[in-house]
Design a protein with these regions (language model features):
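Flavin-dependent oxidoreductase catalytic core characteristic
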Residues: 1-210
Length: 210
């Protein structure tokens, strides 16, 4: 609701001294980035929670094992990627508020400080990233990646025909191919130098999380 400046595309609130900051493109960019991370993160958590229920309650032993395999793959992503996303989201929240975001008046700075500890406890994100790339991807011979990739392909086939979804589905398909190439390249590099896994793990986790 804060009034500050005028919209580049023209005055939006002529009866007021200035326009709300939400009309400014950069503010909208930051808000939409936060929205994407928060809503996407919730869906990822819901998906993981559903698989946990399936692993405990599904009467089919094969289905329970499939859920356990998926949980093992998703856990370092949920912990590692979403905690880094929390830092970015809260940092953007401070930025949206400007100087008032940095002081205690709004409470936003407390959210940012609270988020900062999350990449550290319960296994640092570096450890989570090593778990993902070293154990869940390379350690399974790529089976875990193939499992999640197959699910993504099924979703693309299922929803790709919807006009409003088609561009996103096509882009997701490209990202899936890039992920496969990235993993293959890292696998070759790691054979020559195992330290490549540790050096690339955190960035790899971020790529997979996105």
């Amino acid at each position: 609701d804060r009034l500050q400046g005028r919209a580049m595309s023209g005055v939006k609130e002529p009866g007021k001294a200035a326009d709300p900051i939400i009309v400014h493109p950069d503010v909208r960019r930051m808000l939409l980035t936060q929205k994407a991370f928060v809503e996407g993160g919730r869906v990822l958590c819901f998906l993981t929670g559903r698989e946990i229920d399936s692993a405990h309650l599904n009467p089919d032993p094969q289905a329970r094992q499939a859920s356990n395999d998926l949980i093992a793959f998703l856990t370092p992503i949920v912990k590692g990627f979403l905690t880094e996303a929390a830092m970015e989201v809260t940092s953007l929240a401070v930025q949206v508020h400007g100087g008032h975001g940095f002081i205690r008046q709004t409470g936003v700075e407390q959210l940012m400080r609270d988020a900062r500890i999350t990449p550290i406890y319960e296994g640092t994100n570096g450890v989570q990233a090593l778990d993902l790339l070293g154990r869940k991807v390379f350690g399974t011979g790529g089976k875990s990646q193939q499992m999640i990739a197959a699910r993504i392909v099924d979703s693309i086939k299922k929803f790709g025909g919807m006009p409003e979804i088609a561009p996103l589905a096509a882009d997701l398909g490209k990202r899936l191919e890039q992920w496969g190439r990235l993993t293959a390249e890292l696998g070759l590099a790691a054979k020559g130098n195992p330290d490549e896994v540790g050096a690339a793990a955190v960035d790899y986790l971020r790529v997979v999380g996105h």
